[in-house]
Amino acid sequence: MIIADNIKQFHSIRNSLIKQQKIGFVPTMGALHNGHISLIKKAKSENDVVIVSIFVNPTQFNNPNDYQTYPNQLQQDIQILASLDVDVLFNPSEKDIYPDGNLLRIEPKLEIANILEGKSRPGHFSGMLTVVLKLLQITKPNNLYLGEKDYQQVMLIKQLVKDFFINTKIIVCPTQRQPSGLPLSSRNKNLTSTDIEIANKIYEILRQDDFSNLEELTNKINSTGAKLQYIQKLNNRIFLAFYIGKVRLIDNFLKETGPSC
């Protein structure tokens, strides 16, 4: 596996690739888990070259504490990527991605950008779309692999690719879950054993609910010791975000299936 720690190194690697080679790209913020691994394996099966990026993007965090406490396990991540035969790890610094600071940003005007996560985390989608555009311009992949767990993010990136005429196909992969139904997330690494017990109770409640009374469901979730930030039905999906202690988790799933594995 080749590791590029800056854009100049990456461009040299990217330019050396044969034009006919199909390139798959999996953007991450590190702290890799089986959800990321499933994306990488999918990319490996469909491309000649797989690029994974690790960059914790500061502009998509509206809470400084969330940014400061985001899990960092770079050496472990490198071992995971090497074991998966990833071809290139792009691990840029903030200075690489924002050489002149955060001077230009994508400001989404779509309705989906202003509800749920957009409403709860002002500026999040702007920062996310800005860095995704930068990463796509740098990596120039044929295929981009994203997880369904970040559903709003996926919808906005699809619009980004369309509006900026980016010649990249987006492949959306199913959310990977623990046996309890809890979606895999890098932030899960910050959960204590007690927090995990609370999360398991929440997903036991969710698996048994028919989502006909969200107020009653809110009370049930809050009774576990968690703090529900929102739960909402949108089309045929259930979206929710909640805190367990200081850890914020999000999820979405089809109403008919619930949070099934």
Swiss-Prot record:
<dbReference type="InterPro" id="IPR042176">
    <property type="entry name" value="Pantoate_ligase_C"/>
</dbReference>
<dbReference type="Pfam" id="PF02569">
    <property type="entry name" value="Pantoate_ligase"/>
</dbReference>
<dbReference type="GO" id="GO:0015940">
    <property type="term" value="P:pantothenate biosynthetic process"/>
</dbReference>
<dbReference type="InterPro" id="IPR014729">
    <property type="entry name" value="Rossmann-like_a/b/a_fold"/>
</dbReference>
<feature type="binding site">
    <location>
        <begin position="29"/>
        <end position="36"/>
    </location>
    <ligand>
        <name>ATP</name>
    </ligand>
</feature>
<keyword id="KW-0566">Pantothenate biosynthesis</keyword>
<dbReference type="GO" id="GO:0004592">
    <property type="term" value="F:pantoate-beta-alanine ligase activity"/>
</dbReference>
<feature type="binding site">
    <location>
        <position position="60"/>
    </location>
    <ligand>
        <name>beta-alanine</name>
    </ligand>
</feature>
<comment type="similarity">
    <text>Belongs to the pantothenate synthetase family.</text>
</comment>
<keyword id="KW-0436">Ligase</keyword>
<feature type="binding site">
    <location>
        <begin position="147"/>
        <end position="150"/>
    </location>
    <ligand>
        <name>ATP</name>
    </ligand>
</feature>
<dbReference type="InterPro" id="IPR003721">
    <property type="entry name" value="Pantoate_ligase"/>
</dbReference>
<dbReference type="InterPro" id="IPR004821">
    <property type="entry name" value="Cyt_trans-like"/>
</dbReference>
<dbReference type="GO" id="GO:0005524">
    <property type="term" value="F:ATP binding"/>
</dbReference>
<comment type="subunit">
    <text>Homodimer.</text>
</comment>
<feature type="binding site">
    <location>
        <begin position="184"/>
        <end position="187"/>
    </location>
    <ligand>
        <name>ATP</name>
    </ligand>
</feature>
<keyword id="KW-0547">Nucleotide-binding</keyword>
<keyword id="KW-0067">ATP-binding</keyword>
<dbReference type="GO" id="GO:0005829">
    <property type="term" value="C:cytosol"/>
</dbReference>
<keyword id="KW-0963">Cytoplasm</keyword>
<feature type="binding site">
    <location>
        <position position="60"/>
    </location>
    <ligand>
        <name>(R)-pantoate</name>
    </ligand>
</feature>
<feature type="binding site">
    <location>
        <position position="153"/>
    </location>
    <ligand>
        <name>(R)-pantoate</name>
    </ligand>
</feature>
<comment type="function">
    <text>Catalyzes the condensation of pantoate with beta-alanine in an ATP-dependent reaction via a pantoyl-adenylate intermediate.</text>
</comment>
<comment type="pathway">
    <text>Cofactor biosynthesis; (R)-pantothenate biosynthesis; (R)-pantothenate from (R)-pantoate and beta-alanine: step 1/1.</text>
</comment>
<feature type="active site" description="Proton donor">
    <location>
        <position position="36"/>
    </location>
</feature>
<protein>
    <recommendedName>
        <fullName>Pantothenate synthetase</fullName>
        <ecNumber>6.3.2.1</ecNumber>
    </recommendedName>
</protein>
